[in-house]
Amino acid sequence: MSYKNVKNLTDDFTTLGHIAWLWANSPLHKEWSISLFTKNILPAIQHDQYILLMRDEFPVAFCSWANLTLTNEVKYVRDVTSLTFEDWNSGERKWLIDWIAPFGDNNTLYRYMRKKFPNEVFRAIRVYPGSTEAKIIHVQGGQINKFTAKKLIQQYQEELIQVLNNHKKIVRG
């Protein structure tokens, strides 16, 4: 059994409170369940795979990400609630899990992420409030070569589509 330093645990609970407040103020997230909140937020905090932007000691934006294997990526695309704690840091394929900026700080968070991950490519499942449809979007770091980013995005997309199509063939049998 392992124990966390009390200060860090206190910091984690403070962080959790800040994120909960942002979640409650997001037109999209405030309609989601507390079980989804814990499934999306606790692993991000525990793996230190999040950004929480503060202004004047006030939380204004939050972003979390998971590093997935292709297998876990397929699982996530099929069911965004499927990730386990272990899945969050299982591979090199970066996915934005949550992006919350309910007070107009979306561009600030975007610039921060591009600077923090200058040579990375992220994907995200974008859901719009009131919609039952989603789409996969791409976000790239501020210094990655556009050709390299495009090539990587295309590779990831082709691999994902191939696995999804193979699964359909198996299911249809």
UniProtKB/Swiss-Prot annotation:
EC number: 2.3.1.-
Matches recorded under Pfam families: HlyC (PF02794)
InterPro entries assigned to the protein according to its UniProt record, in alphabetical order: RTX_toxin-activating_protC_bac (IPR003996)
Active-site residue numbers: 29, 98
Keyword Transmembrane tagged: no
Keywords, alphabetical: Acyltransferase, Cytolysis, Cytoplasm, Transferase
Catalysed transformations (reactions): a fatty acyl-[ACP] + L-lysyl-[protein] = N(6)-(fatty acyl)-L-lysyl-[protein] + holo-[ACP] + H(+)
Localization per Swiss-Prot or TrEMBL: Cytoplasm
Gene Ontology annotations for the cellular component aspect, listed alphabetically: cytoplasm
Gene Ontology MF, one: acyltransferase activity
Disulfide topology: none
Family: Belongs to the RTX toxin acyltransferase family.
Subunit record text: Homodimer.
Protein known as: RTX-III toxin-activating lysine-acyltransferase ApxIIC
Organism of provenance: Actinobacillus pleuropneumoniae
Protein's gene: apxIIIC
